[in-house]
Amino acid sequence: MTENVNEHTQGHLLGAADIRRIAADAGISPTKKFGQNFVIDPGTVRRIVREAGVTADDHVLEVGPGLGSLTLAILETGATMTAVEIDPPVAERLPKTIAEFMPDAVDRFRVVNRDALTVNPENLPDFKDDDSFTLVANLPYNVATPILLTLLERFDNLGTFLVMVQKEVADRLSEKPGSKIYGTPSVKLAWYGTAERVGVIGRNVFWPAPNVDSALVLFKRYPGGHTPAADNADGSVVDRETVFRLIDAAFGQRRKTLHAALKKIVPSEAFEKAGIDPTRRGETLTIDEFVALARALDEVFAS
């Protein structure tokens, strides 16, 4: 038992034999369409929950629960949780798995059969009244970044996340300016908070085994929901959409200078106001520098 295991929660986690039996009983096969690679190692899911710091007081969102390996490890802490699963047969089977392997957790669990890219506070009201909630997930590799940015945009109270993603994606999400892999995901995520890679996961803990290694990314949101640099003196906030538009344009032509990449939307006066050299490339700018450029752009157009 780890420190995250709630002493009042009875049950056990899924091993390889359990996963294969559940899949066979339900007629489920992992599909590339939904990026399904099911975790078959109890030690790995407990490690994820431990890194996430989940406790019995938490309300947890899981995206892509699959057959329930990580789900059971989260419930083992005593936490309350909602799982969003896109695949109907998998979503239908999940409550049965919880009832079989951890029956006393049934009342703390709900599954929603929906594409995570379509969720919002209206169609997923479970978290509406929470001051803050956490995301813990083994995300489908092909849509991991869009899911994270979509959830952060739509749920102001998504305070932290611990996700397992493809190692290459994890490196991009947590990278700093100046690197070849620093890009749109890195800088947009930095608008909301800080991210770091906190571990690497081998391929042999999955069924089927993926062709790439995985890694864990831990994210903590800024108290105000965005980088403090976006706060204006009058209490307003620099427009996020303007900042993201500049990011998209700068990285859309990342080998060009800022002057060349942004010439259609940023006049030279804005670079001057922001104190940013237009001969630099977008890949060298921090999120706070993109914010400064967006603020300067607003000031130029307002004058």
UniProtKB/Swiss-Prot annotation:
GO molecular function: 16S rRNA (adenine(1518)-N(6)/adenine(1519)-N(6))-dimethyltransferase activity; RNA binding
Transmembrane segments: none
EC number: 2.1.1.182
Keywords tagged on the record: Cytoplasm, Methyltransferase, RNA-binding, rRNA processing, S-adenosyl-L-methionine, Transferase
Root EC class: transferase
Disulphide bridges: none
Reactions accelerated catalytically: adenosine(1518)/adenosine(1519) in 16S rRNA + 4 S-adenosyl-L-methionine = N(6)-dimethyladenosine(1518)/N(6)-dimethyladenosine(1519) in 16S rRNA + 4 S-adenosyl-L-homocysteine + 4 H(+)
Subcellular location: Cytoplasm
Pfam families given in the database record: RrnaAD
SMART domains, sorted: rADc
Residues involved in S-adenosyl-L-methionine binding: 37, 39, 64, 85, 115, 138
Coiled-coil portions: none
InterPro entries: KsgA/Erm, rRNA_Ade_diMease-like_C, rRNA_Ade_Mease_Trfase_CS, rRNA_Ade_methylase_Trfase_N, rRNA_adenine_dimethylase, SAM-dependent_MTases_sf
Record's GO cellular component terms: cytosol
UniProt family annotation: Belongs to the class I-like SAM-binding methyltransferase superfamily. rRNA adenine N(6)-methyltransferase family. RsmA subfamily.
General function of this protein: Specifically dimethylates two adjacent adenosines (A1518 and A1519) in the loop of a conserved hairpin near the 3'-end of 16S rRNA in the 30S particle. May play a critical role in biogenesis of 30S subunits.
Identification of the protein by name: Ribosomal RNA small subunit methyltransferase A
Source species of the chain: Bifidobacterium adolescentis (strain ATCC 15703 / DSM 20083 / NCTC 11814 / E194a)
Underlying gene: rsmA
